[in-house]
Swiss-Prot record:
It comes from Arabidopsis thaliana. Residues 1-25 are annotated as: Disordered. Residues 21-69 form the F-box domain. SUPFAM superfamilies: RNI-like (SSF52047). InterPro entries: At1g61320/At1g61330-like, LRR_At1g61320_AtMIF1, LRR_dom_sf. This is FBD-associated F-box protein At1g61320. PANTHER family: OS02G0105600 PROTEIN, PTHR34145:SF77.
């Protein structure tokens, strides 16, 4: 087929330009209605300022997102005035989304008025973030009467819900609470009322003792996030449909009654005052994670899997295999005794593993590692028995690579033991010149003769 001539290309461009003028084909009243309804409110306000044609356009926006209203460093009184004006001028019958990031002190009455207007207009998504005030707002919202809401995110805002509400939050799919008091009756009320709940986030909330989730009758509950709730001592989950579990905090007791659906877990364990915890606290929970396909965790998790004395001078690993795991990320935290040996011992129990990420951006190995040198190095580097063969592994990434000799041990391990390896990326921090080690040119050359696809990037 012959390429188009210059004249043909010009005609095509002219035809395209004609099609790109919607105002010539769409009636002006329809265009104005579409803009006033479907443009996010801040885009609509900007259009009204910049365009004379749309200066008198009514406010019917379904999306009232004011999260970026501080971008021009407006004063609080100006921000409140803009929002108040929008609500006073809003002519639409519905508001689907209201996002507010504001210091609430002194304007509580206006916030209550705005939210009540949203409830009257069948709000579907409500996000209230009062973190700017650094003080929890006790907003008197009666959620027992809110039926249309599907997404609710509250930051630094008190949350209450009656235990047996006939309508309240029956359609809610996503609930995210941050920096608020959560009690046992609150959790019970959530799962008694929100029968369509899919996702629950509890971030920096205050709750003592036990977090018990009874979702055995829920068919859609798939995701749970529990982040930094230091007063918790135990988590008990009866959630047969749970697929994704994220926990960030100290090692505590966990009991998951049914794990058939659980596929992904992010277990970012931290230490209490930089002390070591009892290994048994974590070992007792490992059985709940053996069916995972995706796991992200810290070195505290690996420490629980290291060999222990079982009597008569014998050392044994806890008997856990992760036969479905395909993606694994390990973040090194200080202090830790973990080395390549601990990584390799875990990986050999993951026969389907395809991707590995090792994050050492906030960690540096010691200059001398005598235990590794004396007890583990020879075992790891012995390739005659292929104990550490990773047949399915294709992708490896090391975040925070600084050229330390033990980092090269890790790189060499993967290029020698992963016959299907396709990508090996070493991400170096741009500001790590003071931490970077003198390159071991000879060793790097040896590694590249085994696998030439090593890629070094700066991030």
């Amino acid at each position: 087929m012959a390429p188009p001539t210059k004249r043909t290309r010009v005609e095509m461009a002219e035809s395209s330009n004609k099609r790109m003028k919607p105002s010539e084909t769409v009636p002006e009243d329809v265009l104005e209605l579409m803009m006033s309804t479907y443009l996010p409110v801040q885009s609509l306000l900007t259009t009204r300022v910049l365009s004379k044609r749309f200066r008198e356009t009514e406010v019917r926006s379904l999306d009232l997102d004011f999260s970026g209203i501080y971008s021009r460093r407006r004063r609080k009184v100006e921000v409140v005035g803009i929002i108040e004006k929008v609500f006073n001028q809003h002519k639409g019958s519905e508001i689907h989304r209201f996002v507010l990031l504001l210091n609430h002190i002194g304007v509580e009455d206006k916030i209550i008025s705005w939210t009540n207007t949203c409830f009257d207009k069948n709000i579907k998504e409500l996000v209230l973030d009062f973190s700017k005030s650094r003080k929890v707002m006790a907003i008197p919202i009666d959620f027992s009467a809110v039926e249309s809401l599907q997404v609710l995110k509250l930051r630094w805002c008190k949350f209450e819900i009656p235990d047996s509400s006939p309508k309240g939050l029956k359609l809610l799919k996503t609930l995210s609470l941050m920096r608020t008091q959560v009690m046992v009756k609150t959790i019970d009320a959530i799962f008694n009322n929100c029968i369509h709940l899919e996702s629950l986030e509890l971030i920096e909330c205050r709750m003592d003792g036990i977090l018990s989730i009874r979702a055995q009758n829920h068919k859609k509950f798939k995701s749970l996030v529990v982040s930094f709730m230091p007063d918790l001592r135990h988590i008990r989950l009866d959630a047969p449909t749970l697929e994704n579990y994220k926990y960030d905090g100290y090692v505590i007791c966990v009991n998951i009654l049914i794990t058939n659906a659980l596929k992904e877990a992010n277990l970012y364990y931290t230490r209490i005052r930089r002390l070591y915890h009892q290994k048994s606290d974590l070992v007792d929970t490992l059985r709940f994670y053996t069916r995972l396909t995706v796991l992200a965790t810290t070195t505290i998790f690996l420490e629980a899997l290291t060999k222990r004395y079982v009597g008569e001078g014998r050392l044994e690993n806890p008997p856990f295999k992760f036969e479905n795991l395909t993606e694994f990320k390990i973040s090194f935290i200080t202090p830790t005794f973990c080395t390549l040996f601990d990584i390799a011992e875990f990986l050999k129990e993951c026969p389907k593993l395809k991707q590995v990420v090792i994050d050492i951006q906030n960690f540096t190995f010691e200059p001398q590692m005598y235990f590794w040198e004396i007890h583990h190095k020879a075992q790891i580097q012995n390739t005659s028995n292929n104990n550490y063969l990773l047949k399915c592994l294709t992708d490896v990434k090391i975040i925070g690579y600084k050229g330390h000799w033990h980092e090269l041990d890790i790189v060499e391990f993967f290029v020698k033991n992963a016959p299907s390896l396709k990508r090996l990326e070493l991400q170096m921090p741009k500001n790590a010149k003071n931490d970077a080690h003198t390159p071991d040119v000879a060793r790097i050359k040896l590694i590249k003769t085994i696998f030439s696809g090593v890629k070094v990037t700066e991030v």
